[in-house]
Design a protein with these regions (language model features):
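Selected alpha-helical membrane-embedding segments in polytopic membrane proteins
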Residues: 66-75
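Glycine/aspartate-rich loop-and-adjacent alpha/beta segment that forms the canonical ThDP
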Residues: 14-17
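Interhelical loop and helix-boundary elements at the membrane-water interface
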Residues: 1-5, 19-63, 76-176, 180-231
C-alpha cells in the first residue's frame, strides 16, 4: 500500500474513534472521565496496528507521525481556546476545563509523535512504551476507581488494584500487539519469546506509575518503559 494512502486510512480511523468517544460523552452515555480514559486506552493499539499498512520506506514513519501530530495540535488549539470544541473538552477533561487538555492529553500526543519517529516498527522498544501508556496507565484509573483495594503506603492516591491493572493491562496489550506483528511477519516469533522482556518493562512502568507524578505520568511511564526496553530487548 502507498504510504500516503496508509496515512489517509490511519487518520480516518483515528478521527472516527475520537469523534465516537466525543459523541458518547456529549450524549451523557458515559461520564467525561471514563470517556477520557477510553480514548487513552483505545487510541494507541489502533494507531500502532495501522503501522502494518505502511510499506518499508523511509517516509512511512514521518507520514504516520503526522496523524498524532495533527491531533495533538488540535488538542493544543482547543486547550488554548483558539478552537471551540465542547465535545472534545467534555470527552478529554476531568472537570470540563479546556485547559486540562494542555496537560495529560497533550503530553500523550507528544509521546506518540516522538516514539513513532524514533522507534517506528523497526524496533521492539517503542510499542511496549506506548502500550504501557495506553493499556497500563489508562486502565489503572478505571480499575482503581471501581475496585476497592488498599492504598499504596508511598502514594495514598494510588491503590493496589490500580497498580496491578497497570502491570497486567500493559503486559496483555503489548503481547496482543506483538502477537499480531508476529502473525503479520513484522516481528520474528514466537510471541512467547517476548513474555519475559515485556514483564520487565511492565514491572518498571508499574513502579513509576505508582509514584505521584501528577499530570506528567503520560511522560514518565513511556520514558521508563523505553529505558528498560533498551536493557531487555
Amino acid at each position: 500500500m502507498s504510504p500516503y494512502l496508509a496515512t489517509l486510512f490511519t487518520f480516518i480511523i483515528a478521527v472516527a474513534f475520537l469523534r465516537l468517544m466525543d459523541y458518547i460523552a456529549q450524549r451523557g452515555w458515559i461520564d467525561s472521565r471514563t470517556s477520557r480514559k477510553l480514548i487513552h486506552i483505545g487510541t494507541g493499539p489502533i494507531f500502532v496496528l495501522c503501522w502494518l499498512m505502511y510499506p518499508d520506506v523511509w517516509i512511512s514513519r514521518w507520514l504516520a507521525a503526522l496523524v498524532p501530530l495533527l491531533i495533538t495540535v488540535q488538542f493544543a488549539l482547543v486547550g488554548l481556546g483558539i478552537v471551540r470544541d465542547e465535545a472534545a473538552v467534555k470527552a478529554m477533561s476531568r472537570t470540563g476545563d479546556r485547559r486540562e487538555i494542555l496537560r495529560g492529553p497533550l503530553f500523550y500526543g507528544i509521546m506518540f509523535v516522538v516514539i513513532t519517529l524514533v522507534f517506528w516498527k523497526e524496533s521492539l522498544i517503542g510499542i511496549p512504551a506506548l502500550m504501557m501508556l495506553c493499556g497500563g496507565d489508562g486502565i489503572a484509573d478505571i480499575v482503581g476507581r471501581r475496585v476497592r483495594s488498599p492504598k499504596l503506603s508511598w502514594s495514598p492516591e494510588k491503590s493496589v488494584a490500580g497498580s496491578l491493572s497497570v502491570f497486567f493491562g500493559g503486559w496483555l496489550m503489548t503481547i496482543f500487539v506483538f502477537a499480531i506483528y508476529v502473525w503479520a511477519g513484522a516481528f520474528s516469533g514466537p510471541v512467547t519469546g517476548y513474555f519475559l522482556p515485556v514483564t520487565w518493562v511492565a514491572l518498571g512502568a508499574t513502579i513509576i506509575e505508582s509514584l505521584s507524578f501528577k499530570d506528567i505520568d503520560n511522560l514518565t511511564v513511556p520514558l521508563a518503559s523505553i529505558l528498560i526496553g533498551y536493557l531487555v530487548f
